[in-house]
Curated annotation (Swiss-Prot):
Function field: Lyase that catalyzes the C1-decarboxylation of 4-hydroxy-3-methoxy-5-(all-trans-polyprenyl)benzoic acid into 2-methoxy-6-(all-trans-polyprenyl)phenol during ubiquinone biosynthesis.
Stated name of the protein: Ubiquinone biosynthesis protein COQ4, mitochondrial
Catalytic class of the enzyme: lyase
Listed pathway(s): Cofactor biosynthesis; ubiquinone biosynthesis
Any GO BP: ubiquinone biosynthetic process
C-alpha cells in the first residue's frame, strides 16, 4: 500500500512554530505564518477588502496568503520556462520612480509605451512607489515574483486604459486572473456587489467578456520586461502581446452621467 506524502511545508508549519518561537525570516521583511495564521489572514483580508475595496493593504495580504502553496509556484515556473522571464528573475528589476525616470517617459513620443504609462500615472494621480513589499510568501524567489506582479499592475492599467475606480479595478483583476491564475485576482469578482446598477450592467455586458477573452488570449504578462520596451509603439506592443483594448471606461461613465442629467432636466 502506497503511503500518503505530506508536503514538507505543512509538516514544518505544524510543529515547533508559535508566536513566541517563530522561524527565522527567509528575506528582509519576511513574516513566516502557520497554516492557521495564513487561513485566518486570508479570510479576514477577503472580508475586509470586500467591505472596503480601497484598502490596498488588505488586498495585498489576500494576494499573498492565497498564492501558496501552488499558484505562485506556477507563475514562477512560467517565468523559468520563458527566456525573458528567466532574465527578469536573474536581474530582479524594480519598478519605482527611482528606477524609471518619469520626466524622460513624458518626453517620449505620445504613442510610446513610456509616454502612455506616464500619462496614465498623471491622469490617475498615482505613483509607482505605492506598492507594498511582500511579507507572507516563504520562498524568497516566489516573493520576488509576487512583488514583480504587484509592480507591473500599473503597466496593465496603462496598456488597457482602465482607470482606478472600483469598476476599472474589477475588470483588470479578472483580466489578471485569466492571465496569471492568482486566486486573489479571481476572488475580486465578489466586488461586483459594490457596483451600482449601470456599472454592474456594463461589467456583465462589456468588461467581463473583454477581461476573460483578452486575459486568456494574451501572452504571460509576468514575462514581459516592461522597462526594456518603453520606447516601443504601444499599439504594436499590444498586438504583439495579444492585448485587446476595452471600450473607454471613462468615456462610457461620462456619457452615462450626461444621459442621467438630461433625463432629470426633461422631467
Amino acid at each position: 500500500m502506497s503511503r500518503l506524502k505530506i508536503p514538507s511545508q505543512l509538516l514544518r508549519g505544524g510543529r515547533g512554530f508559535s508566536v513566541l518561537s517563530r522561524p527565522a525570516a527567509n528575506y528582509a521583511g519576511h513574516v513566516p505564518l502557520t497554516p492557521v495564521e495564513r487561513c485566518t489572514m486570508a479570510v479576514g483580508s477577503a472580508i475586509g477588502s470586500l467591505l472596503n475595496p480601497r484598502r490596498h493593504d488588505l488586498i495585498a495580504t489576500l494576494g499573498e496568503t492565497t498564492a501558496t502553496p501552488y499558484f505562485i509556484y506556477r507563475l514562477r515556473d512560467a517565468m523559468l520556462s520563458d527566456p525573458t522571464g528567466r532574465r527578469i528573475l536573474r536581474d530582479r528589476p524594480r519598478i519605482t520612480s527611482q528606477t524609471l525616470s518619469l520626466p524622460y517617459l513624458r518626453s517620449l513620443p505620445p504613442t510610446s509605451l513610456g509616454a502612455t504609462f506616464a500619462s496614465w500615472l498623471d491622469r490617475e494621480g498615482v505613483s509607482p512607489d505605492t506598492r507594498s513589499r511582500v511579507r507572507y510568501i516563504d520562498d524568497e524567489e516566489c516573493a520576488y515574483v509576487m512583488q514583480r506582479y504587484r509592480e507591473c499592475h500599473d503597466f496593465y492599467h496603462a496598456v488597457t486604459g482602465l482607470p482606478i475606480v472600483v469598476e476599472g479595478e474589477l475588470a483588470l483583476k479578472i483580466f489578471e486572473y485569466m492571465n496569471t491564475g492568482l486566486p486573489m485576482t479571481g476572488l475580486s469578482a465578489a466586488a461586483v456587489v459594490r457596483l451600482k446598477g449601470a456599472e454592474r450592467q456594463r461589467f456583465w455586458d462589456v468588461y467581463l467578456p473583454w477581461a476573460v477573452r483578452s486575459g486568456a488570449g494574451s501572452k504571460e504578462l509576468i514575462c514581459v520586461y516592461w522597462e526594456e520596451l518603453l520606447e516601443r509603439d504601444v499599439g504594436e506592443l499590444r498586438a504583439e502581446l495579444g492585448i485587446e483594448v476595452p471600450p473607454d471606461m471613462r468615456e462610457m461613465r461620462r456619457r452615462h452621467r450626461k444621459q442621467k442629467q438630461q433625463e432629470k432636466q426633461e422631467k
